[in-house]
Amino acid sequence: MLLTIDIGNTNLTLGLYDGNNLFAHWRLATDHARMPDEYGLQFQGLLKNANHTLKDLTGICLASVVPQLTARVVQACREYLDMEPFVVDVGIKTGIKVKYEDPKSVGADRIADAVAVMYQYGGPACVIDFGTATTFNAITKEGEYLGGAITAGINLAAEALFTHAAKLPRIDLQRPPSIIGRNTVHAMQSGLLFGYVSMVEGMVERFRKELGPSMKVIATGGLAEVVAQETDVIQIITPWLTLDGLRILWDLNHPL
């Protein structure tokens, strides 16, 4: 069994793979105050709940965009799972060509997404990851990762409105009754959801001009389904794309 761990700014996502099959998955809140012992005990508990023990683990593959938590999770894996995790970083085998000007600055999650898409769907493709930040990633037919675009995620934008506009409330992201909000909550929901959908449609159109008409559009992340319900430009939704990418990266760097 392979344990994959994706450390994001909002969530820590884990997947347990039996071969290519995602056997179990979990999504935890990212907690900057949590110590290695707490992470380790939690990981042990998750394995137990999945009816597995440490003896069943054959490897751990980890990607992180939160440097201050990486060391804690690595320590937790060493001390509580008795295993040194494989950390996605510059210099590992990816099977794709990273054309970013500074490859070291590309988030490990973006590389994992690109690898998963290239191996599972092929290019050209635009991969949209709806997380704390929403990223658009461009992959050519030849398997080149070109880069992409980064913008604030929907929830981050909603929180910014609440934090910086005195009279605007904190809201749940739901579909309003109409594009024209008749109260403040519905107006905010309209602006956030439909405005975001329009942004996605516009970005996809611009990416397609660069990558060609055969470009696939694949979405992942917690809000992918919410956005996809409002537009036809998203062709494939893969909730656990990043974890799939980590599994593939593990296999590429640990051949049988």
Show where each model-derived region lies.
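A short acidic, often aromatic-flanked loop/helix-cap motif at beta-alpha or helix-coil junctions
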Residues: A33-R34, I92-G95, L241-G245
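Phosphate/pyrophosphate-binding loops at sites that engage ATP/ADP/AMP, CoA/4′-phosphopantetheine
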Residues: F43-G59, M203-M215
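Residue-level signal for inorganic ion chemistry
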Residues: L14, L62, G131, L161, ...
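Short beta-strand-loop/turn "lid" adjacent to the catalytic site in phosphate-handling enzymes
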Residues: A50-S105, E142-G148, G153-I154, R182-L193, ...
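Phosphate-binding/catalytic loop of phosphoryl-transfer enzymes
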Residues: M83-F86, I92, I96-H164, F194-V204, ...
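ATP-binding/phosphotransfer module of carbohydrate and carboxylate kinases, centering on a glycine-rich
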Residues: L2-T4, T30, A158-L256
